[in-house]
Every structure is written in structure tokens, then in C-alpha cells.
């Protein structure tokens, strides 16, 4: 066997080992000593995976130079097998390992190809009262169910920006699904975000919770509220979008790095120049449009019936289904 082949096989074996143990300490990375390791951990980069998914610019502020940061990021990505091209077949094999959380609504699960995916950001858009927060509450319960019942046997993180989280609703849904209501609440890590900056800090802090606990769902309800309130007017639009872009990028990295399903809700805004068709469009512009992996639009129908439409997806066809909001949660 050639030296080159042996080296390649060794790299593959090392990447497989690290992939099976993603929480390997950052100080185990080649070229990282205790001092640099301590600096990285102080800023929230505890593992090789944390560093591999970080941006060079962020690390440069910690280690002192972009050149040094580039070396560290490349070493981490090489260790994880993220440093080169792979075949489309390997991508397919990896996607077969994607996990899904049932919404608890059979028709909606079918529309989504089995439920809410991990390693992706799913955006839920709709007017006030369309059922966005109700769906988030239900997902925070559903993720706790065992896999044979549509869940992942895991916990959830819930970042609330508009004070709409209700423990009482969680208890109702949990009881209807055969879970102990108090235990269901105990399996949800909750935080109220009071500003856009606070919201972004909470996402950073969520990484630590995910590492320490069996978390498979992160909810941000709503992702846009603070950004719209703090950056009003066209004169602040560029700054708002730049900040929102970083926030969405952080959520995408978190979803992929930790095999977590990220669900964000989004508000709608009117288009006064539209005279035909739907005059509403999602807030957040192209930043959210390009940042979310899957986009779901909820709207009211008669009484307690809601309509869910998938309107943007890499592979799902457009389609819509109806569901009902009851005391027991969302049902067909």
C-alpha cells in the first residue's frame, strides 16, 4: 500500500472516530495548547466541532490573527472530514440519517416529508392567531416522545421574544399525548429574550445546553420581532439586515453542528402596492428567505381550522393541508 493511500485511510479513520465522538475537547486539536484552549472555551468554543463550524473572523478576535484562526478552523474541519469534496452518494447516505420530529398532525407530517427535520431551519410564517406559537408549543412536547411515537426522546430549548410561551398549554398538550405534564415542562429549557442582542446571546448560550443535555429542538418565537422594533425605517434597514443575517447564520450552523431541528416563527407585512393576490409577505426580506431551509405559511380558515402551505423547500413540492387547533393541541 502506498504512503499516500495509508495517509488517506488514516484520515478517514480519524474523521470517523471524531464524528462518532463529536464532543472531543478543543485542546485535543493539533496546535491548540492550554492557553489558547482556555481562551476559546471562555468564548464558548469547547469542542473540535464548535471550532469547525466557526467563522475565521470570530476566532481571529480570540487567537490574535486571521492567519492563526484560519489554521485552527482548517485543522478542525480536517479532523471532522469537512475539508474536502464528497460524492453526491455520500451526501445521500448522510441525509438518510436525518431525524424528524412529528408535528402531531398526520397530514402536515406528510406535507413535510415526515416531520420537522434536524440539521435544518424551518420558518413558520403567518398573521397573528394563525397558529404559529401553537405549533411551537406542540413541537416542544412532540420531541419528547419516543421515536416510535414520532418524537426523538429528547428535550427542547424555547426562546420567547414576545411573551407568548404558556406552560399551561404545554401541560394540556403533554397530557393529551400521554406524558407527565410536570416532566414535560422540566424537559423544556425556556428563556425570554428582551432585545435582538439578547436573543443572539441566548442562541450562543444554547450551544452549552445542547452539549450537556439531550436537546433536539430549538424554537425562536419570533425571530424577527426585536429586529423590527429596534431598527425601524429604511435608514436602519441595512444595519438590521446585516445583524439578522448573522443571527440566521448562527442558527444554521447550530442546527448542522449539533443535529438539532431549529424552528423560527416569522411575522408578515403588507405590500400596499399589491392589488391582486395575497398582499402579505414574510418579514425579514431576502435574508430570511435565503436563510431558512423550509418555509411554511399558516393562515386562518373557519372556526378552529388552519391551513398550512409549504411555499419554499429544496425538494418538497408546493402543497397545503388543513388542521384543527383543539384543547388537546393540533390535530387532523
Swiss-Prot record:
It comes from the Archaea. The keyword Nucleotide-binding applies. GO terms for biological process: DNA recombination; DNA repair. SUPFAM superfamilies: P-loop containing nucleoside triphosphate hydrolases, Rad51 N-terminal domain-like. The keyword DNA-binding applies. Belongs to the eukaryotic RecA-like protein family. Involved in DNA repair and in homologous recombination. Binds and assemble on single-stranded DNA to form a nucleoprotein filament. Hydrolyzes ATP in a ssDNA-dependent manner and promotes DNA strand exchange between homologous DNA molecules. This is DNA repair and recombination protein RadA. It comes from Pyrobaculum calidifontis (strain DSM 21063 / JCM 11548 / VA1).
Amino acid at each position: 500500500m502506498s504512503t499516500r493511500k495509508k495517509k488517506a485511510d488514516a484520515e478517514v479513520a480519524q474523521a470517523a472516530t471524531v464524528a462518532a465522538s463529536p464532543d472531543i475537547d478543543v485542546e485535543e486539536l493539533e496546535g491548540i495548547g492550554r492557553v489558547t484552549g482556555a481562551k476559546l472555551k471562555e468564548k464558548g468554543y469547547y469542542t473540535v466541532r464548535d471550532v469547525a463550524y466557526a467563522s475565521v473572523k470570530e476566532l481571529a478576535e480570540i487567537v490574535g490573527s486571521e492567519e492563526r484562526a484560519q489554521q485552527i478552523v482548517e485543522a478542525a474541519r480536517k479532523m471532522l472530514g469537512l475539508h474536502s469534496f464528497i460524492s453526491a452518494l455520500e451526501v445521500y447516505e448522510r441525509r438518510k440519517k436525518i431525524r424528524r420530529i412529528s408535528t402531531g398532525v398526520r397530514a402536515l407530517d406528510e406535507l413535510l416529508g415526515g416531520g420537522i427535520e434536524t440539521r435544518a431551519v424551518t420558518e413558520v410564517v403567518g398573521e397573528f392567531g394563525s397558529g404559529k406559537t401553537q405549533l411551537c408549543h406542540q413541537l416542544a412536547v412532540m420531541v419528547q416522545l419516543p421515536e416510535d411515537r414520532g418524537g426523538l426522546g429528547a428535550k427542547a430549548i424555547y426562546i420567547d421574544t414576545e411573551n407568548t410561551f404558556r406552560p399551561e398549554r404545554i401541560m394540556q398538550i403533554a397530557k393529551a399525548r400521554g406524558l407527565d405534564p410536570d416532566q414535560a415542562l422540566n424537559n423544556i429549557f425556556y428563556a425570554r429574550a428582551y432585545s435582538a442582542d439578547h436573543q443572539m446571546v441566548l442562541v450562543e448560550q444554547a450551544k452549552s445546553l445542547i452539549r450537556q443535555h439531550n436537546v433536539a429542538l430549538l424554537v425562536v418565537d419570533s425571530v424577527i420581532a426585536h429586529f423590527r422594533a429596534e431598527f425601524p425605517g429604511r435608514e436602519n434597514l441595512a444595519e438590521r439586515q446585516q445583524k439578522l443575517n448573522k443571527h440566521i447564520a448562527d442558527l444554521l450552523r447550530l442546527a448542522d453542528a449539533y443535529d438539532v431541528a431549529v424552528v423560527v416563527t416569522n411575522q408578515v407585512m403588507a405590500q400596499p402596492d399589491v392589488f391582486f393576490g395575497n398582499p402579505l409577505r414574510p418579514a425579514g426580506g431576502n435574508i430570511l428567505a435565503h436563510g431558512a431551509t423550509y418555509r411554511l405559511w399558516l393562515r386562518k380558515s373557519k372556526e378552529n381550522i388552519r391551513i398550512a402551505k409549504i411555499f419554499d423547500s429544496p425538494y418538497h413540492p408546493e402543497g397545503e393541508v388543513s388542521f384543527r387547533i383543539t384543547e388537546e393541541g393540533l390535530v387532523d
